């Protein structure tokens, strides 16, 4: 019987294939501390990583045969340290695609139609003063241009969904891909053309603070920013200034640089819709994520090559 360490209290649906093994997992909705992980990881043959897993923790996992990242983005795992230890790290990009794309579209609608702002005003103001034709005008998605930065699985799915709303779609990606639903362009063109910009690139040294004050200055006045990728891609101070000045009409944010903290200055703005990193938070998606991680672990235990190894082993 192998021991599998699960760093966070994830839903157990989808883990049935691992029930013959010893599962170490914290209480639901909680997570092991770094010290607890250091104490437990020497006992583990595999890890399902739902958050940060630094090199000093990985290196004491002498029995580890695989680290299965519970998500598409794996910037929280020190993949170089794992590679140096001969431990493959996997991710599960396919299972989160549709749910995250749906959330991006939902945030576009919420910001464009001022749904979040109107919900807040109805709860704290005189409702009668909020009704009336011509008040609090929003904007439709139809006919507007969506700029997608990062056209991997999720970016492509967002492009397909946006087309169904009648949007024109342009895309900028590290490796341009041929898309029936989007036209490739460079980043300056995208920033200056798009009415809505949606981020779907990974957080790397190259993309950290990709959208800074200079980038916001290139955007169309009244543009909207959607971020369901990683908070570190955006310079939050520059974003806040662009929102307050009116350079941006609004933003829909699911991710933040220092989660679980959300900058108070963003929460204070009515034209910002914030969600707490819920891109994959559907029952169906979470079960699919657990099932995919379980299969990767079983493949590693059986001497097979798991799918989606991200650290070159």
Model-derived features: where do they sit?
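N-terminal Rossmann-fold NAD(P) dinucleotide-binding loop
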Residues: 155-156
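Short beta->alpha connector loops at strand-helix junctions that form conserved
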Residues: 26-29, 70-71, 87-98, 173, ...
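Short, Asp-centered acidic motifs that coordinate Mg2+ and/or phosphate
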Residues: 45-46, 66, 196, 224, ...
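Glycine-rich Rossmann-fold phosphate-binding loop(s) that bind the pyrophosphate
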Residues: 151-152
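Phosphate-binding beta-alpha-beta segment of Rossmann-like dinucleotide-binding domains, i.e.
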Residues: 85-87, 93-145, 160, 172, ...
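An N-terminal-biased, well-structured beta-alpha scaffold segment characteristic
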Residues: 1-90, 192, 212-214
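Rossmann-like dinucleotide-binding domain for NAD(H)/NADP(H)
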Residues: 85, 221-313
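Rossmann-like adenosine-cofactor binding region
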Residues: 55-58, 168, 174-265
């Amino acid at each position: 019987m192998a021991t599998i360490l699960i760093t966070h209290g994830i839903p157990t649906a989808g883990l049935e294939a691992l029930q013959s093994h010893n599962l170490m997992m914290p209480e639901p909705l909680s997570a092991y501390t770094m010290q607890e992980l250091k104490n437990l990881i020497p006992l583990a043959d595999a890890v399902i990583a739902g958050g940060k897993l630094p090199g000093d923790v990985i290196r004491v996992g002498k029995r580890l045969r695989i680290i299965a990242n519970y998500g598409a983005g794996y910037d929280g795992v020190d993949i170089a340290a794992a590679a140096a230890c001969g431990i493959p790290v996997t991710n599960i990009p396919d299972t989160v695609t549709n749910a995250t794309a749906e959330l991006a579209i939902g945030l576009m609608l919420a910001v464009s139609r001022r749904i979040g702002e109107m919900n807040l005003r109805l709860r704290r103001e005189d409702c009668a003063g909020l009704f009336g034709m011509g008040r609090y005008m929003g904007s439709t998605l139809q006919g507007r241009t969506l700029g997608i930065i990062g056209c991997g699985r999720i970016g492509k799915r967002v492009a397909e969904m946006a087309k169904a709303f009648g949007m024109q779609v342009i895309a900028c990606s590290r490796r341009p891909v041929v898309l029936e639903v989007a036209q490739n362009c460079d980043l300056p063109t995208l920033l200056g053309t798009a009415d809505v910009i949606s981020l779907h690139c990974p957080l790397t040294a190259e993309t950290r603070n990709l959208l800074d004050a200079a980038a916001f200055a290139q955007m169309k006045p009244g543009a909207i920013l959607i971020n369901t990728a990683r908070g570190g891609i955006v310079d939050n101070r520059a974003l806040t200034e662009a929102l307050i000045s009116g350079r941006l009409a609004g933003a829909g944010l699911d991710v933040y640089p220092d989660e679980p903290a959300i900058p108070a200055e963003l929460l204070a703005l009515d034209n910002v819709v914030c969600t707490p990193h819920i891109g994959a938070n559907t029952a169906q998606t979470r079960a699919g994520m657990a099932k995919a991680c379980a299969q990767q672990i079983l493949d590693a235990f059986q001497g097979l090559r798991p799918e989606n190894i991200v650290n070159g082993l």
